[in-house]
Amino acid sequence: YMRKDNLDIYVTGSNSKFLSSDILTEFEGRGDEIHILPLSFSEFYSAYDGSKDEAFDDYMVYGGLPAVALMKTDEQKSNYLITQMKNVYIKDIVARNNLNSDQEISELVDILASGISSLTNPRKLENTFKSVKNSTLCASTIDKYIGYLKDSFLLSKAERYDVRGKKYISTPYKLYFEDTGLRNARLNFRQIEETHLMENIIYNELRYRGYNVDVGVVEFREKTAEGKDTRKQVEIDFVANQGSKRYYVQSAYNIPDEEKWEQETRPFEKTNDSFKKIVVVEKSIKPRRDDKGYVMIGIKEFLLNNDSLDI
């Protein structure tokens, strides 16, 4: 087939025998990798039989795997996702990497699922295993396991980026789930933490749109009430880059007053640049701009408008 003209070959699927990295190796530069992500909320909603609010609630809990989007009952969705997580993802990772059992990597997935949007690294996770699991899983093994989870497209890693220093900070970092439904299934749908899940969804959406997404760190100096010069550090949830374009995005579930708005936008002020700055909130609101040019937009409005970053 490789010798025939006008013929494209698509090799699909990843399993314990053949991951996408193996496909690229086999074709030795003659092929391209296309990462097929779960459905975006816009895609999910286009086929959803219900209101926008109902669709988002479903999407947050059960994610965007196409098979799930076609299922009618919550029981069907939850059973399917739990089975996929246990009998497909975990089993394939164990088989692929010749692990002796699934216990350690399963426990690691549980810990990571409970801590989405939190800064972490292998050393911190090693300490968690010691204190919570009474286990001695070393940092180097944890780092290796995280690599396996990324290779299987279960997790995605967001590095920290020093905005003013223009450099990456290797550790700690954040890990997000490629699909929130799989994350929730791993925890048997017990921890539906809307604040963290919304952040995960925004991260995934930015990647769907083709952006490289980092966690922003802004360091600055500030004088205390006593006049002492101190160094401070604030975080921007996401720095989205694509070529010469950059956007700063904060995920804020609720902004009840001006004080909370100031807290969320303070990191924007410290960047000292003119890139677009956006705060996404859970409440359904049309885009609005303050006197500094910062935009507030509702999560559903943000997800359903492909041009929402440029409003």
In which residue ranges do the predicted regions lie?
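A short alpha->loop->secondary-structure connector
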Residues: 1-6, 25-33, 237
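Sensor-1/coupling segment of RecA-like P-loop NTPase cores
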Residues: 2-24, 149
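Interdomain motor-coupling "hinge/lid" segment immediately C-terminal to the ATP-binding subdomain
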Residues: 14-16, 20-119, 123
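Short, polar loop motifs at secondary-structure junctions
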Residues: 16-18, 280-287
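Accessory nucleic acid-recognition modules appended to NTPase machines
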Residues: 74, 79-246
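Active-site ExK catalytic segment of metal-dependent nucleases
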Residues: 241-256, 264
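Arginine/glycine-rich "motif VI" loop of SF2 helicases in the C-terminal RecA-like domain
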Residues: 266-275
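Domain-level recognition of nuclease-like catalytic cores that cleave nucleotide substrates
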Residues: 283-311
